[in-house]
Amino acid sequence: MRGTLYIVSASSGTGKSSIVNATLERDQQIALSISFTSRQPRPNERHAQHYYFVSADEFQRMIEAGDFFEYALVHGDWKGTARQSVEPQLAAGHDVLLEIDWQGARQVRSKIPDAISIFILPPSRAALEERLRKRGQDSEEVIHLRLAAAHEEMAHYDEFDYTIINEHFETAVSEMSAIFTASRLRRQTQKIRHANLIQTLLTP
């Protein structure tokens, strides 16, 4: 049975990575695909754990070689998912989660229409700004740029299957877990997973 592809998107400061990491700690059936990026690592980030950090030239070489499943220019830096991180895993029946922006999500849906997509929104603009400032990673100028970009990014929430409002962290994690559980209970999934049982039950 082919694996399920999940897409999770949000604007900066929404808590996307924290929600994804907490959810995947509880759900060992889904593998997080680590993205490539041309930006510099932040102090708490590690190569091959948070991102694969490469130069802009190397990223362009990978684009030209057709190595990416999806890629986009985000806040002035390139981000992308390698084909090798997704296609073999899905073919082997493993579920894969992509933590990408709306541009990449649109590319993925054009290739895999049955991918399940989730967009995370903040409870308010004030909360989003507060979270960006609490990170302590960006200058005032960068914070203003990210807030301006967030408005454009959030406008694409209606392109996704599910919307989670991250007002209370544990609630948001539970809601994401519920989406994963529900997707496994879909008729088309259960029909394949329990084919022998269903055939036995329906045989006169």
From Swiss-Prot:
Keywords: ATP-binding, Cytoplasm, Kinase, Nucleotide-binding, Transferase. Its main location: cytoplasm. GO terms for molecular function: ATP binding; guanylate kinase activity. It is an enzyme of class 2 (transferase). ATP binds at A10, S11, S12, G13, T14, G15, K16, S17. It catalyses: GMP + ATP = GDP + ADP. Its EC number is 2.7.4.8. One of its GO terms (cellular component) is cytosol. Disulfide bonds: none annotated. CDD domains: GMPK (cd00071). NCBIfam families: guanyl_kin (TIGR03263). HAMAP family: Guanylate_kinase. This is Guanylate kinase. It comes from Xylella fastidiosa (strain Temecula1 / ATCC 700964).
